[in-house]
Amino acid sequence: MSILTRWLLIPPVNARLIGRYRDYRRHGASAFSATLGCFWMILAWIFIPLEHPRWQRIRAEHKNLYPHINASRPRPLDPVRYLIQTCWLLIGTSRKETPKPRRRAFSGLQNIRGRYHQWMNELPERVSHKTQHLDEKKELGHLSAGARRLILGIIVTFSLILALICVTQPFNPLAQFIFLMLLWGVALIVRRMPGRFSALMLIVLSLTVSCRYIWWRYTSTLNWDDPVSLVCGLILLFAETYAWIVLVLGYFQVVWPLNRQPVPLPKDMSLWPSVDIFVPTYNEDLNVVKNIIYASLGIDWPKDKLNIWILDDGGREEFRQFAQNVGVKYIARTTHEHAKAGNINNALKYAKGEFVSIFDCDHVPTRSFLQMTMGWFLKEKQLAMMQTPHHFFSPDPFERNLGRFRKTPNEGTLFYGLVQDGNDMWDATFFCGSCAVIRRKPLDEIGGIAVETVTEDAHTSLRLHRRGYTSAYMRIPQAAGLATESLSAHIGQRIRWARGMVQIFRLDNPLTGKGLKFAQRLCYVNAMFHFLSGIPRLIFLTAPLAFLLLHAYIIYAPALMIALFVLPHMIHASLTNSKIQGKYRHSFWSEIYETVLAWYIAPPTLVALINPHKGKFNVTAKGGLVEEEYVDWVISRPYIFLVLLNLVGVAVGIWRYFYGPPTEMLTVVVSMVWVFYNLIVLGGAVAVSVESKQVRRSHRVEMTMPAAIAREDGHLFSCTVQDFSDGGLGIKINGQAQILEGQKVNLLLKRGQQEYVFPTQVARVMGNEVGLKLMPLTTQQHIDFVQCTFARADTWALWQDSYPEDKPLESLLDILKLGFRGYRHLAEFAPSSVKGIFRVLTSLVSWVVSFIPRRPERSETAQPSDQALAQQ
């Protein structure tokens, strides 16, 4: 190139061009790409006045306007990317930067829109104000109870007839489209309304569309003339029926969360009952157990009415010695039947308190735990059990491996944030094995903790409900623990839960037997059905292959009718769940969670349905390390198999599209879209199986807390604790912190009105941020540190409120990125024999994605004007 440019260009220009070529090469561009980049630059200088101030401004904003194009490392087709992105910018900015006269022309519409939103926000309060007199006045109060029941029965019967007509009425495509547009319009209007009314309306609309869909599937979409199509269609219909049942039961379960608040205790402490705290342990490390014991010693409860027990099923001498040193009671069994349930039942023989509180050995209670929960027991004498959330201060495998800790609600947030609150409305709260209080009298009546299944907690609450006792749930986190450290451990835990719930379904079916209310039966059945999702999920992941590979019509209907029934069913369900579950489960994430577990929970649940006594109990390991990033090939093997199977479907689908009958082209397209969606979800499952590093033995907890540090010369610095762990803290100094580097300082923390001092060493200094390492502590200092940090009453209360609201489209984009990330990991960690295949595929997808236009990043100077415009 140098010879040609030296001949064509003057020396100064040639020198600059050679310098640019070398710069391209230095940033990793190939010789061909660098040469072509220089050629494009010459053409740009010839035809575009790049020296003009306007073009100079565009070049200065290159990183914001063209975020996906690296100007220092050109690629051969960058001009095409520039062209597509420029067109996108012109179209996008033309909508946003509307001239002022035009804005005024549409100001009337903007005012109407603003008034509409204001009216929708004020509507619930207006309705409440207009109808508050009805709370005191009963319109049918003058009638007898029998007459009121008759009127209610007539209304319900009439409503059911209307619903049946609405669901079963056949429509032609145009009528179906108009009907769906009406429902969709109502949904878009209602979803913006705050309060429970909008959620109830969305549930009604979703059920209407979904019931029409399932009716249509049963009556119009099975091919009875082709055995292969019939069998495949029935298999898919089975999975869809399961999903529809779970959808309906799920709506019922969370239709009106109770959101129970604490009841104050009597001022006379002599009326407070005695409580035994049980901490069962088997093979956990003593360092894991210490924190819960130290925190329990500081619980705000009369010391003469509080007994703490270590239930050691491992019979370890170091645990016995530790219990003796800190002044708690210790029990070790000589036999170990029935695992955790047997361990607790053995301790019940020795404990004599009126109530028993159970904690897994990694759950650390706050000091307010008993004061927040015990008031309800004194108010309601039939209350047998109070459950609080299982909160985790360490990331679970999904959060850690995907880098989503405290950015996206984790897998358990939906259950403890919404489902249990919904169960509480129907008096169907489940005992979850930890972070709960149980009244001894009902527990003794049912013979202690249930031992017939491996999920002894849920079975115990079922037995209490059968006896006529009530349960309660308080959504305020009052304890926190360690999440599972690896995906394999997480899956093992879920396998045990799935097998146990199916065992209960077989051995003590909530649909049969005495003692349960109808609503309780439905809530228990839905919980058990949830763990039967393995087989239906696998069916959904392979269903489109039936047509592509076997030419089986699993939905025997025109593609237009499939779109008119399937898409509204999915969209309404997604919209409704986004409204109800927004803070607790973001859209499309259930697909990832269920896909990861599907292959592994399907066999044990099927075995438990056939033989409920088969299987064994396994203990979930906590507190482990992951020293190097790696792909868990054993866990990911099923996902990779499904990926390869779907890729075969893609290849066959492409062949069918070009060489198959023209009448099937639209059906092939629909099937291919389904396959690509499955590939995205499977890619997400693969991404989860890449274990990220976890080299900290002590997990850091983010928290803002005032504190102070004192140097050895007595000089004090006020500071704010930003995070803490069992081994140190991160603080922010009000001022320069460089003078503290390497020094030994005392950390001052407050608990109530009392101040505690802890010796620390400054481990790092970055600006005004300081990392402190705890020096060796005495037992009493360790107790005080745990009670000043982990056991503070307000430590976990606001964590659930930190999650952003669900935005379905953004969530879908996250899932797309997650799926692509999974395939990149396969290319990175795959064996050398197949690494080339994955690398080619991911490179091809990355190359295609590189042409997609991006939304430009906003500059700092543009933000105030945009905000001002929004306020105007």
Question: In which residue ranges do the predicted regions lie?
Answer:
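N-terminal membrane-anchoring/stem segments of glycan-assembly enzymes
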Residues: S2-L271, C523, S533-R537, Y659-S689, ...
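Structured alpha-helical
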Residues: W7-L8, V13-A15, R25, E629-Q872
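Long helical/loop segments within the catalytic core of UDP-sugar-dependent glycosyltransferases
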Residues: Q253, I331-F355, R367-V454, H465-R466, ...
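Cell-envelope/extracellular polymer assembly enzymes that use nucleotide-activated donors
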Residues: S274-D276, N307, H459
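Short, acidic, metal-binding catalytic loop of nucleotide-sugar glycosyltransferases
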Residues: Y294-K305
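A conserved acidic beta->alpha catalytic loop
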Residues: D312-F319, T335-H336
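The conserved acidic donor/metal-binding loop of glycosyltransferases
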Residues: D360-V364
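Catalytic donor-sugar/metal-binding loop of nucleotide-sugar-dependent glycosyltransferases
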Residues: R463-A479
